[in-house]
Swiss-Prot record:
<keyword id="KW-0508">mRNA splicing</keyword>
<dbReference type="GO" id="GO:0048477">
    <property type="term" value="P:oogenesis"/>
</dbReference>
<dbReference type="GO" id="GO:0035145">
    <property type="term" value="C:exon-exon junction complex"/>
</dbReference>
<dbReference type="GO" id="GO:0000226">
    <property type="term" value="P:microtubule cytoskeleton organization"/>
</dbReference>
<dbReference type="GO" id="GO:0051170">
    <property type="term" value="P:import into nucleus"/>
</dbReference>
<dbReference type="GO" id="GO:0016325">
    <property type="term" value="P:oocyte microtubule cytoskeleton organization"/>
</dbReference>
<keyword id="KW-0217">Developmental protein</keyword>
<dbReference type="GO" id="GO:0003723">
    <property type="term" value="F:RNA binding"/>
</dbReference>
<dbReference type="GO" id="GO:0007315">
    <property type="term" value="P:pole plasm assembly"/>
</dbReference>
<dbReference type="GO" id="GO:0071011">
    <property type="term" value="C:precatalytic spliceosome"/>
</dbReference>
<comment type="function">
    <text>Core component of the splicing-dependent multiprotein exon junction complex (EJC) deposited at splice junctions on mRNAs. Involved in exon definition of genes containing long introns, including the rolled/MAPK gene. The mago-tsu heterodimer interacts with the EJC key regulator Pym leading to EJC disassembly in the cytoplasm. Has a role in oskar mRNA localization to the posterior pole of the developing oocyte, and may also be involved in polarization of the oocyte microtubule cytoskeleton.</text>
</comment>
<dbReference type="InterPro" id="IPR036605">
    <property type="entry name" value="Mago_nashi_sf"/>
</dbReference>
<dbReference type="GO" id="GO:0000398">
    <property type="term" value="P:mRNA splicing, via spliceosome"/>
</dbReference>
<dbReference type="GO" id="GO:0008103">
    <property type="term" value="P:oocyte microtubule cytoskeleton polarization"/>
</dbReference>
<dbReference type="GO" id="GO:0008104">
    <property type="term" value="P:protein localization"/>
</dbReference>
<keyword id="KW-0509">mRNA transport</keyword>
<dbReference type="GO" id="GO:0007317">
    <property type="term" value="P:regulation of pole plasm oskar mRNA localization"/>
</dbReference>
Amino acid sequence: MSTEDFYLRYYVGHKGKFGHEFLEFEFRPDGKLRYANNSNYKNDTMIRKEAFVHQSVMEELKRIIIDSEIMQEDDLPWPPPDRVGRQELEIVIGDEHISFTTSKTGSLVDVNRSKDPEGLRCFYYLVQDLKCLVFSLIGLHFKIKPI
């Protein structure tokens, strides 16, 4: 698989007491990782980071997504976005393009109570894996001090 046929974007956020708070990241076909985290809690400011990742990271992302089987899911039976918040996941791999929108999921209890627990569980675990990978990449890229 070449990098030209891959794109991923994830967003989770809500508008509440502290304004529009959100986490968003995307991987572009050229390997650029864009990350934004906005929290107005205690007057925090928006954190924006950009970095380029190696081709092997892009290949691993594709593998994670393909192994998750998320491309076969449908968000129609999932809970719609509400006052608690919304999640969006957009993925392009080759000529396949999917876009999911659902409410924020606090835990597996929320997943199990949904109309499609199997599909939403697939989404839930994939999002956890993606967030873990992105937090690690951002942390490594911006916090490692040279010896």
